[in-house]
Amino acid sequence: MKLHELKPSEGSRKERNRVGRGTGSGNGKTSGRGHKGQKARSGGGVRLGFEGGQLPLFRRIPKRGFTNINRKEFAIVNLDVLNRFEDGTEVTPELLIESGIIRNEKSGIKILSDGNIEKKLTVKANKFSAAAKEAIEAAGGKTEVI
């Protein structure tokens, strides 16, 4: 086989469909848009959620809830991620940011118990789940709320 003999595999390349190029092509005159109407016009089409003039679902259903502007959002760290640190390391928020585990502290850091921990670490965070605290202490480590 030579370079000039290379061809793309069958069915991997599809030719662009050129519309509005004569009635013989099968896609001439109206270019596959049918006759008149909103969808035949340039830029024509209905907005998202439009139901043909019927009151749309998002307006039929009542409003519910609100966004609390004073909410606290915690950066979440799971136990299995903490295994990358050496035994006896003091894991602080600064160390977590430095090592790229979290991007920023947000309203604080919460340690959750996804995965398991084999290292003996001193973990400093704003919050711990009960299971995470138990697992860290079972591995011989300490938890400190800051």
From Swiss-Prot:
Gene3D superfamilies: 3.100.10.10
Region (Disordered): 1-50
CC per GO annotation: cytosolic large ribosomal subunit
The entry's keywords: Ribonucleoprotein, Ribosomal protein, RNA-binding, rRNA-binding
Tree of life domain: Bacteria
Bridged cysteine pairs (disulfide): none
MF-aspect GO terms: rRNA binding; structural constituent of ribosome
Entry-linked Pfam families: Ribosomal_L27A
Biased composition annotated in UniProt, kind: Basic and acidic residues: 1-18
BP terms from Gene Ontology: translation
Composition-biased stretches (Gly residues): 21-31
HAMAP family documented for this protein: Ribosomal_uL15
Quaternary structure note: Part of the 50S ribosomal subunit.
Biological role: Binds to the 23S rRNA.
Family label: Belongs to the universal ribosomal protein uL15 family.
Protein name (record): Large ribosomal subunit protein uL15
The organism of origin for this protein: Listeria welshimeri serovar 6b (strain ATCC 35897 / DSM 20650 / CCUG 15529 / CIP 8149 / NCTC 11857 / SLCC 5334 / V8)
